[in-house]
């Protein structure tokens, strides 16, 4: 990761605190050339970061329903806010000091760097003007994403951050990158972009 004096956990907290301070004045009229492949590259890094646990895992009878209505936004600005929130939570989760020992730290840091850079790009899409009341997306959307990731955090904590628990959470992270791709593709359809997106078929 880029060298700095802040721990990944502290930086992730700062990122999560930053979002409410953003205005909802959306200024990104065009997605960048590399945006089309962001989710695909992230899935590749996630797969390389998290190999299967050393021991077989029992079947996990637990689900984390994602608020699918957030993927059907008709507003480009709101789609960007949702994407930003998902990525901030993913950064926070994957920078945990409790990730399994068999995960590949160097690749995980590459993944965190990629997420961090894209978060920074999305933050630049918001212009700092307007009152505090204009600086938040819909409260229900904010709460539903928080609830989703809080349930994942509670699951990890309840199971003492075991390797098998993290493997189940890895699948949730994989789904989140696919949700991010859905949002990016929707935003791409509202703006010219020459890069063609690769299919997200990583298992």
From Swiss-Prot:
It is found in: Secreted. Keywords: Antiviral defense, Cytokine, Disulfide bond, Glycoprotein, Secreted, Signal. Pfam families: Interferon (PF00143). The keyword NAD does not apply. The keyword Transferase does not apply. SMART domains: IFabd. This is Interferon type B.
């Amino acid at each position: 990761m880029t060298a700095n004096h802040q721990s990944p956990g502290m930086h992730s907290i700062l990122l999560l605190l930053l979002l409410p301070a953003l205005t909802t004045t959306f200024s990104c009229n065009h997605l960048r050339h590399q945006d089309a492949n962001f989710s695909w590259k992230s899935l590749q890094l996630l797969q390389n970061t998290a190999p299967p646990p050393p021991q077989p895992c029992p079947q996990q009878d637990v689900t984390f329903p994602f608020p699918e209505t957030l993927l059907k936004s008709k507003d480009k600005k709101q789609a960007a806010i949702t994407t930003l929130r998902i990525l901030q939570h993913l950064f926070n989760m994957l920078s945990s000091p409790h990730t399994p020992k068999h995960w590949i730290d160097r690749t995980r840091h590459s993944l965190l760097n990629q997420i961090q850079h894209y978060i920074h790009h999305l933050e630049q899409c918001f212009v700092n003007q307007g009152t505090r009341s204009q600086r938040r997306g819909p409260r229900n959307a904010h709460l539903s994403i928080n609830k989703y990731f809080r349930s994942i955090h509670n699951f990890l904590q309840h199971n003492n951050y075991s390797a098998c628990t993290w493997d189940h959470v890895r699948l949730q992270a994989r789904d989140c990158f696919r949700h991010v791709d859905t949002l990016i593709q929707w935003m791409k359809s509202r703006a010219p972009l020459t890069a063609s997106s690769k299919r997200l078929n990583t298992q």
